[in-house]
């Protein structure tokens, strides 16, 4: 567990960072849902449905060691979280010997704690974990608000495209 002090406008916060566990699946799910709601990504019923499927998925990924997450707490309140998904990946010209890629997801900070460097701290935790595992390529999808944070950390815009099959099964 890591503790650090953050001084903002004469306010001292005693924050604690810890690794996410299976017990945090509900919190991670709530933060993910709030992250998408903040970005107006989808209507509430769609986010509810996503959350219903996400929680058992993230439990499984944590149990299998494929999702490594961190939680920041202020006293007894969990205020921020993020995760690193470990993906099997084909060797690529960006990393010709690597067989894994990292994907940072669920970076969320409660509104009253934003603009204090917490998203950056969580992203750094994810990047450090990727380095410990020898993962050299890490991707993420950034909101408009988050993009400057990630660019400051060295992320660049890529040419990745996305296709979503919207036909009903």
Language model features with spans:
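Conserved beta-strand in the GNAT
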Residues: 71, 77-86, 103, 108
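Conserved beta-strand-loop-alpha-helix junction that forms the acyl-donor binding cleft
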Residues: 138-149, 163-166
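Conserved GNAT-fold acetyl-CoA-binding loop/helix
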Residues: 36-58
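A short helix-loop-beta-strand connector motif used in the catalytic cores of GNAT acetyltransferases and
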Residues: 56-71, 103
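Conserved GNAT acetyl-CoA-binding A-motif
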Residues: 123, 130-142
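A short beta-loop-alpha structural element at the N-terminal edge
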Residues: 16-30
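Conserved acetyl-CoA pyrophosphate-binding loop and the N-cap/start of the following alpha-helix
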Residues: 113, 117-125
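Conserved acetyl-CoA-binding loop of GNAT-fold acetyltransferases
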Residues: 24, 135, 151-161
């Amino acid at each position: 567990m890591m503790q650090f002090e953050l001084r903002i406008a004469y306010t001292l916060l005693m924050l604690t960072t810890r690794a996410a566990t299976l017990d945090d699946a509900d919190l991670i799910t709530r933060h993910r849902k709030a992250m998408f709601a903040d970005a107006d990504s989808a209507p509430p019923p769609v986010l509810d449905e996503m959350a219903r499927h996400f929680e058992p998925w993230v439990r499984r990924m944590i149990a299998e060691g494929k999702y490594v997450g961190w939680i920041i707490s202020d006293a007894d309140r969990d205020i921020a979280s993020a995760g690193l998904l470990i993906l099997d990946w084909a060797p690529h010209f960006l990393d010709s010997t690597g067989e894994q890629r990292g994907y940072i997801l669920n970076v969320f900070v409660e509104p009253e704690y934003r603009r204090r460097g917490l998203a950056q701290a969580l992203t750094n935790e994810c990047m450090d974990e990727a380095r410990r595992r020898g993962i050299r390529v890490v991707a993420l999808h950034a909101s408009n608000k988050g993009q400057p944070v990630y660019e400051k950390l060295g992320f660049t815009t890529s040419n990745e495209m996305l296709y979503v099959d919207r036909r009903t099964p």
